[in-house]
Amino acid sequence: MKELTMLSLSFFFVSALLAAAANPLLSAADSAPNPVLDIDGEKLRTGTNYYIVPVLRDHGGGLTVSATTPNGTFVCPPRVVQTRKEVDHDRPLAFFPENPKEDVVRVSTDLNINFSAFMPCRWTSSTVWRLDKYDESTGQYFVTIGGVKGNPGPETISSWFKIEEFCGSGFYKLVFCPTVCGSCKVKCGDVGIYIDQKGRRRLALSDKPFAFEFNKTVYF
């Protein structure tokens, strides 16, 4: 009886190993992070345009850029900001995972974020997000554009963000904590909203994350 049981167990484990070997893609899919979903429950697709819509009402609208400082000085590259009006979705965004073959955007994975169909200023043609250096005047790390798409490594470390689930199904936050360079020391943190003296709602590292949903853009 014991011999029969041992034979049955051996057959089970061998069958399981053969099944896993025959289905490597299925095994990889099972271990992959969850896909990011839009407000319709559909998976976010790489390179597709989406609006970021804040979860909290009466706390601003979508995301865009501002090329002026609080004192009116022009800056380039511009800063990433949230619009003040809730009804204003403003500029669409596209997301590009570290793995260029990945066609689905997933949580907890390094990715580039860039504004679509937008020319920031004549000194830079890049609309890719990046985390700027520490701003001593405000004590903040601000999000700007002018980053580098792809080419993960030390030279592009400031251009990689992550999407994480936050406070319920369909709600998300942005995080800066890239893992594309194992030897690099980075300042990790959630991306939140910093309101300057002119009332501009600027994206910056914060202990209060900016919670939002994704809404697929529609062109007429």
Curated annotation (Swiss-Prot):
Expression sites (tissue/organ): Expressed in fruit pulp after pollination. Not expressed in seeds, stems or leaves.
Highest taxon above the source species: Eukaryota
Residues bearing glycans: N71, N215
Disulfide bonds: C76-C121, C177-C188, C181-C184
Quaternary structure and partners: Homotetramer; dimer of homodimer.
Keywords associated with the record: Disulfide bond, Glycoprotein, Signal, Taste-modifying protein
Similarity section: Belongs to the protease inhibitor I3 (leguminous Kunitz-type inhibitor) family.
InterPro entries with a match to the protein in the record: Kunitz_inhibitor_STI-like_sf, Prot_inh_Kunz-lg
PTMs per UniProt: Glycosylated; contains as much as 13,9% of sugars (glucosamine, mannose, galactose, xylose, and fucose).
Pfam families: Kunitz_legume (PF00197)
Function text: Miraculin has the property of modifying a sour taste into a sweet taste. This alteration of taste perception persists for many minutes.
SMART domains linked to this entry: STI
Record's protein name: Miraculin
Organism: Synsepalum dulcificum
Leader peptide range in chain numbering: 1-29
Molecular functions (GO terms): endopeptidase inhibitor activity
